[in-house]
Amino acid sequence: MNGGQAHQRFGMQIPKFQSQNHHPHHTQQPHHHTHHNQASHNINHQHQFSSGALASATPHFTPSHMQNGAHTNVDEDIDDSMNEHWQQQLQLAAESRQANSPHYHARSVAQQAKGIQIAPSQPDTQEQGSDGQNGVGKTKAVSRQGWHALDFGGQGLRALSTSLFNYVFLEKLYLNHNKLKSLPPTIGHLRKLSHLDLSGNDLTELPDEIGMLTNLRKLYLFDNNIRTLPYEMGYLYRLDTLGIEGNPLNDVLKSHIMKEGTKALIKYLKEEMPVHLPPPDRDWVVLDETASASTEKITVLSYNTLCDSSATQSHYGYAPARVLSWEFRRELILSELRSHGSDIVCLQEIDQGSYNEYFREQLAYNDYKGVYWPRGRAMGMQEEDAKGVDGCATFFKGSKFILLDKQLINFGQTAVRRPDAKGQDDIYNRLWQKDHIAVVVFLENRQTGSRFIVVNAHLYWDPAFKDVKLIQTAILMEEITKLSETYAKWPACTDKAAFRFSKEEGQTEAPPPEEPAPSVQYSSGDQIPLLMCGDLNSSPGSAAYNLIAHGRLDEEHPDLEKRLYGNLSKVGMTHPFKLKSAYGSIGELPFTNYTPDFKDILDYIWYSSNSLHVSALLGEVDKDYLQKVPGFPNYHFPSDHIALFAEFTVKGKKGKVVEADFGPQRN
């Protein structure tokens, strides 16, 4: 994206219907989109711009000729030129040419508000579909802005003020019948636009950033001089109508829209989109350089990989079919895991089949051992069906750590087993039905004797169930507290030798391994270093976040909505750990989940600050790269989430060292 390929377009020199290998394309499912009713307050807001080209525009400009001079040409070699798709093009183009007077659309809205009958325009298409399953919410934020449209039509504009692109709340923008020769790349800032009219200008091309406008339903380009379209228009998966008549568009693109309509052309551009240059590597942000060479360090990676069953065109319609294919994405995921070489890896949304048949085997070559549990729904399923159920997988370096214990926490099942669950309807009706889990492993460093509790969790996603996410978090912390007290009494490890292959004939004797230190015993559970990773589907400042960060939450918290969850909703929620978010050291990342409709922080690596200190972090994704990428997954990021990766130093141990009996020793 940062190199020459970023400006590559579909030029006329490319052969018609060039053949490329692609995975079968999934049928696109519509997403829900709400159109706001435009009232009379939308009119005459052009006075908001007091300087620049917008202010100097004259309201008396009327085009004296049609752009390009050939708005009715249809290539002779294209059949069915009068099918329904092209008939719509001609009809909309005719309507566009009649709208050449100044502020035509704003005046039409005003006339409608006064009850004056005007010629009807093409109705907006209302589509219904399912929301995505990842993220805190996909609903549009409530805006205090009273108007959402601007009409600069018929003004004779030759340039656009940069101030215009600060109006990110705009949903409709009319720039038709002016004298614009180019559209600034900053058009990509107006990501809420559903209607953009650029008809009747002198445009010869569109910027790649047009692909950022993924909410577009209508894009009118009638009567310009456009010969080709940027591949990035393939991101416009919601686009219903592309008005292109009156442009000398090249034959291949014109054939698609004439014969099959807008959707077919957008799909073609999406599937034929070249792989752009990758972004620069994410920076390794060093926070503490004071640690000595002898200081014990541990690295941890957390990653929601987006399971195969969730990576559908209905949820990720902007992504090419190949990008969504699991065979492609799993290779990228594996490559990233290997490149970081983290001591501990916590993966969410890994299905059973992928764990058993791919990741466990592949990561074994890199010294990893794994612990895995699927979500609760896998119980009772046929073996083949259960393979598609996702869960949480925790990997650790086998040469560095000993697995002392592993546990599954099923939030719903744990809740109904609580003594105070009787008569608490919300536990059964809201919480028990959700089968989200956490996986806990208890590890010991073979050489240093330090022990670690590692938690890998995935909470429920739906923003309408804030109470469920909060109670899942409370149960998680309650169960970790119980386990930590058990682990504080765990006996010393007596066998720390890592497996070693016997030397082959002719090989020199390897130096003997360093004598391992005895196991460290901890006086209480909250003294054991704790690392808690996962997709909590909760933003900073949410109830779930605050409970983890502050150690307590009041029973009257509004997220509980006065629902009944036993003692958790009667006396409140607490935990004894002093936890901090690793990325809180840099004010958190701009996002950990990135899609066209949602960009926020959902994923975390929490650590016990009394026993661990964060020393380095993997930084954010390059900002320039994101200017032309509306959402993940794509060819460089295989999930809608990004990986978190942190390095910690182990603080001085507050427990006492327990000498383990290693048996007879050689002198």
Curated annotation (Swiss-Prot):
GO MF term list: metal ion binding; poly(A)-specific ribonuclease activity; RNA binding
Q: Which GO terms describe its cellular component?
A: CCR4-NOT core complex; Cdc73/Paf1 complex; P-body
- Could you say which cofactors this protein requires? Mg(2+)
The record lists the catalysed reaction(s) as: Exonucleolytic cleavage of poly(A) to 5'-AMP
Top EC class, one word = hydrolase
Q: Which UniProt keywords apply?
A: Activator, Cytoplasm, Exonuclease, Hydrolase, Leucine-rich repeat, Magnesium, Metal-binding, Nuclease, Nucleus, Repeat, Repressor, RNA-binding, Transcription, Transcription regulation
Q: Name one GO biological process term.
A: positive regulation of transcription elongation by RNA polymerase II
Q: Where is the signal peptide?
A: none
Q: State the LRR repeat positions.
A: 169-190, 192-213, 215-236, 238-259
Q: What is its EC number?
A: 3.1.13.4
Per the record, which residues fall in region Disordered?
18-40, 55-140, 502-522
What Pfam families does this protein's entry cite? Exo_endo_phos, LRR_14
Q: What is this protein called?
A: CCR4-Not complex 3'-5'-exoribonuclease subunit Ccr4
- Biological source species: Aspergillus clavatus (strain ATCC 1007 / CBS 513.65 / DSM 816 / NCTC 3887 / NRRL 1 / QM 1276 / 107)
Q: What is the lineage of its organism?
A: Eukaryota, Fungi, Dikarya, Ascomycota, Pezizomycotina
